[in-house]
Amino acid sequence: MTQGETHVQTKARGSAGARSLLLTVLGEFVLPRGGEVWTGTLVTALGALGVEEKSARQALSRTAAEGLLGSARHGRRVRWSLSPAGDRLLREG
């Protein structure tokens, strides 16, 4: 396997891992309390778990596009919340 192939495989795993870790963070910390979470808070939490900022932001965007998250803009900042579908997914496991 070449170095380029290894890099591509690592990137592919990274983005799937970012989404999985995002759902874990949401399930552990947002689901029980409800409410909204700032983008920066989620990016920082995912960063502590080894997810790069770009991957964390991509995971947020893609998860929202799937209808699992809602967003509310406050000036230049965004807060995220679980949609009814996201809430249901995390509660049912």
What is each of the regions a protein language model found here?
Residues 59-66:
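Basic amphipathic alpha-helical segments that dock to polyanions
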